[in-house]
Amino acid sequence: MATAFAPTKLTATVPLHGSHENRLLLPIRLAPPSSFLGSTRSLSLRRLNHSNATRRSPVVSVQEVVKEKQSTNNTSLLITKEEGLELYEDMILGRSFEDMCAQMYYRGKMFGFVHLYNGQEAVSTGFIKLLTKSDSVVSTYRDHVHALSKGVSARAVMSELFGKVTGCCRGQGGSMHMFSKEHNMLGGFAFIGEGIPVATGAAFSSKYRREVLKQDCDDVTVAFFGDGTCNNGQFFECLNMAALYKLPIIFVVENNLWAIGMSHLRATSDPEIWKKGPAFGMPGVHVDGMDVLKVREVAKEAVTRARRGEGPTLVECETYRFRGHSLADPDELRDAAEKAKYAARDPIAALKKYLIENKLAKEAELKSIEKKIDELVEEAVEFADASPQPGRSQLLENVFADPKGFGIGPDGRYRCEDPKFTEGTAQV
């Protein structure tokens, strides 16, 4: 049965689940351009030998991986019922949470910039639900849903958005800086590209623990960032280092085609970001980011490679945000027809259709999940609203390593609690 979730065509001379050590990978052939940048591009690579003679390597596609899995499982489906319901619940949580954030922002419960993730849920769910708790995720300013997918509670994320002490950063991080040590959510970053070096460092730490300290560590790191980041220096520097040291990291480009108000096609000399992977000696893959099952299959291969010590992968997920850049953006620059085209490809609606048509779930089961998530999000709002504001003295906590430094006076009290502090007459 033909569906929107037909296996994506992704080809490479070095399969995602294979080794490419000591090979120079260069792109040599692209599929013909199409009107939809998100149509699947085949990736063909060549290997150069010492005599500079060009020789074609075997091409392995994701379809072959999918067929092998289907023959092993004696089924034509890519997921089980349990997996499908888990994916659906996570995507519904992300969408419902962000919709509620919009309501709370316009009611004055949130302040500053708030960037929502509506439309991009297939990317977060497709990758993060394959990870373990000890794996790390590094995000951007559009980080609420990444945190939720990684296991941070809706209460903790909503409270952080409300600026309350019960938030995952005790109310000091806000929308763009979700962090949880418990869940290895290593932060959202307000400046584009700033999270990529952090993610590369986390991956280096995993490799060091395994190879130098001889610890039983197969942790991987997933770094999320947008198309607008891919012209920044940190991106290229970290691709180089990750390939050089064969770090267990997956670089995930959430290409939503717009960097604030700048079209991706106007901002870069070559809009096909995935090609930058082979330039540094790692697989580069382009996948339909509106399709959670396609994303998931690619993610499986990339994560497996990283766990086996075979190095990094660059994955370009072409997706689309259904709202403006932030809640302060009236979204007047994007063409209405373009927005309508992508809205018709809603990843949640597509997954719902797939689950029902393949008899993996009934309408009533999915409605039950939606109801449960609505109640969970509403309860998170009530919890956040009732939570206390952080005390002013908290501003100086966790800033200085010396507990008797600037933040705390000789009497053991925080200096900012001294009335003279606010008067500007305190001796510091």
UniProtKB/Swiss-Prot annotation:
Binding locations of thiamine diphosphate: 141-142, 190, 192, 227-228, 256, 325
Predominantly, its location class is plastid
GO terms, molecular function: metal ion binding; pyruvate dehydrogenase (acetyl-transferring) activity
Superkingdom field: Eukaryota
Q: What InterPro entries does its record include? A: DH_E1, PDH_E1_Alpha_Subunit, Pyrv_DH_E1_asu_subgrp-y, THDP-binding
UniProtKB keywords: Chloroplast, Magnesium, Metal-binding, Oxidoreductase, Plastid, Pyruvate, Thiamine pyrophosphate, Transit peptide
User: Where found, per UniProt?
Assistant: Plastid, Chloroplast
One Pfam family this sequence matches:
E1_dh
Transit peptide located at 1-61
- Matches recorded under SUPFAM superfamilies: Thiamin diphosphate-binding fold (THDP-binding)
Query: In the Enzyme Commission scheme, what number(s) does this protein have?
Result: 1.2.4.1
Q: Which cofactor does it need?
A: thiamine diphosphate; Mg(2+)
Task: Summarize where pyruvate binds, as residue positions.
Answer: 115, 141-142, 190, 192, 227-228, 256
Gene Ontology cellular component terms for the protein in this record? chloroplast; chloroplast envelope; chloroplast stroma; plastid
PANTHER family per the UniProt record, alphabetical: PYRUVATE DEHYDROGENASE E1 COMPONENT SUBUNIT ALPHA, PYRUVATE DEHYDROGENASE E1 COMPONENT, ALPHA SUBUNIT BACTERIAL AND ORGANELLAR
On assembly, the entry states: Tetramer of 2 alpha and 2 beta subunits.
Q: What is known about what this protein does?
A: The pyruvate dehydrogenase complex catalyzes the overall conversion of pyruvate to acetyl-CoA and CO(2). It contains multiple copies of three enzymatic components: pyruvate dehydrogenase (E1), dihydrolipoamide acetyltransferase (E2) and lipoamide dehydrogenase (E3).
Name the record gives this protein: Pyruvate dehydrogenase E1 component subunit alpha-3, chloroplastic
Name the species this protein comes from.
Arabidopsis thaliana
Its taxonomic placement starts with: Eukaryota, Viridiplantae, Streptophyta, Embryophyta, Tracheophyta
